[in-house]
Regions:
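Residue-level signature of catalytic and energy-coupling elements of molecular machines
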Residues: 25, 45, 129, 198, ...
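Hydrophobic/aromatic residues within the transmembrane alpha-helices of Major Facilitator Superfamily
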Residues: 29-36, 66-69, 73, 150, ...
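Membrane-embedded alpha-helical modules
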Residues: 99-213, 326-445
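Helix-loop-helix junctions within the multi-pass membrane cores of secondary transporters/permeases
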Residues: 3-42, 63, 84-93, 97-142, ...
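Juxtamembrane transmembrane-helix boundary signature
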Residues: 64-85
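Helix-loop-helix hairpins and the membrane-proximal interhelical loops
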Residues: 1-55, 168-171, 201-284, 437-438
Length: 445
């Protein structure tokens, strides 16, 4: 046992990164539990196009596991991957249902976008973009992701609800899910203040146990057999994806993945302290997992795979190496057989005729958003040519409900303000701003 422990330590550089095996396992478990909703949401969304629910669920778990394994073993970062939220709705409701394109052809477009991302990664284009982002924008991105996931936590916990007049309003503080969300915030906050190891995981476990007698968590067994992936396996229509009318669809898949992943890498890396002089070590390796997993995922039967912002929950739990990502990969594979347990914690609670809420995981997202807000202190608020782009990035992510769109606000205003102030801007950053503008002018929403 001891030699194996040393080999794991050397491979993942655990001691060098100030962590250990138990910490990494806890971090992986927390990350998985906060991201496990995708196991059930993804097939629910894609099945609207006629795709088989069970096959998509299996493809989702396998593509997520593949991406996490590559991230952990190749890049050695504690970042989880899975099919992305947002882009899956674009796949289902805009491309397939809205444009009348078959889901097979849409998968072909995802497959082609994955190949393009692999090429861009190997040519180091993606790493170049990441390392050229100024430090103040990196801080704005990290804080913006924190605010974004905190807002998601507020929504999933029922603390804020839709309101036609004011967009959002305070939720019903007397409802049981909201009370549980607030209780979870206090519980995890106290555990963190007392510096209890595994505070976030302990909080989630206690909330789950407390939720059982109140009906917020439903025990549905322990083991289930994985669904057959046959109905979607290798069903993508690559030839159809080369149709002239689908070029914009492929480009949207590429664009969203490119900047969503870049934003997540920046945010999580800032939080974990990975950045060295404004650059991310092993950036090219960190960009390969989502590209490969997207390509493989399309072949299996699911939409674009991205780096998950929920990875920040694992970092908050102490995860600092790829071992965290490997643990997440193993859990996604186990979820094929233990989906009832994953659904018990991450599947949410749906009251009669109501919206599904997630009172177990929502407090975790809000807590992590609080932790990531510390990046705002790194911005020089006295320099308007830096403060305004960072601020627009920060507030843009939750208000547009998109990491990529929030980044666009900052990336477009940054070179404009700098140039108008008589300062120089790297040509690549100007090109990115132009591409963002063209993306909205030519490709639409």
């Amino acid at each position: 046992v001891e030699p194996l422990k040393h080999r794991v330590d050397r491979f993942f550089l655990l001691t060098q990164n100030g962590t250990d095996i138990p910490t990494e396992i806890r971090a992986g478990l927390v990350t998985f539990l906060t991201a496990s909703y995708i196991i059930f949401v993804q097939p629910a969304v894609l099945s609207e196009t006629g795709m088989d629910f069970g096959a998509v669920m299996t493809a989702t778990c396998l593509s997520a596991a593949l991406g996490c394994l590559i991230m952990g073993l190749w890049a050695n970062y504690p970042i989880a991957l899975a099919p992305g939220m947002g882009i899956n709705f674009y796949f289902a409701y805009t491309v397939v249902i809205g444009q009348g394109i078959s889901w097979q052809t849409a998968l072909g477009a995802v497959f082609c976008s994955g190949l393009i991302l692999i090429v861009l990664t190997l040519l180091r284009v993606r790493a170049l973009i990441l390392n050229l982002i100024p430090d103040f924008l990196k801080s704005g991105i990290a804080a913006g992701i924190g605010l974004f996931i905190a807002f998601i936590g507020f929504v999933q916990g029922g603390l804020v609800v839709e309101n036609p007049g004011t967009l959002v309003k305070l939720g019903n503080l007397k409802s049981l899910p909201v009370i549980f969300t607030l209780s979870g915030l206090v519980l995890i906050g106290v555990l963190l203040q007392r510096k209890i190891k595994g505070a976030i995981l302990i909080g989630m476990v206690l909330l789950t146990l407390l939720g059982l007698p109140f009906g917020l968590v439903t025990y549905q067994g322990l083991v289930s057999m994985p669904p057959d992936m046959g109905p979607t396996l290798m069903q993508m229509d690559i030839a159809g994806a080369f149709d002239l009318g689908l070029i914009t669809v492929v480009l949207v898949f590429v664009f969203v993945d490119l900047f969503d992943t870049a934003g997540t890498l920046v945010g999580v890396s800032q939080q974990a302290g990975f950045m060295e002089h404004g650059k991310l070590p092993r950036a090219t390796r960190a960009f390969l997992p989502d590209a490969v997993a997207t390509t493989a995922g399309a072949a299996m039967g699911t939409s674009t795979v991205v780096c998950y912002i929920e990875s920040s929950t694992g970092v908050a739990e102490g995860g600092r190496t790829g071992l965290t990502a490997v643990v997440v990969a193993v859990l996604f594979l186990l979820a094929l057989f233990l989906s009832p347990i994953a659904q018990m914690i991450g599947g949410g609670y749906t009251p009669e005729m109501g919206k599904t809420l997630y009172p177990i995981t929502a407090p975790v997202l809000i807590i992590v958003g609080c932790l990531m807000a510390s990046n705002l202190t790194r911005i020089d608020w006295g320099k308007w040519d830096e403060a305004l782009p960072a601020f627009l990035t920060f507030v843009g992510m939750p208000l547009t409900y998109s990491i990529a769109d929030g980044m666009a606000l900052g990336f477009i205003t940054y070179p404009v303000l700098k140039i108008c102030s008589g300062k120089s801007v790297h040509p690549v950053m100007i090109l990115i701003a132009v591409l963002f503008l063209l993306r909205y002018v030519m490709l639409g929403d």
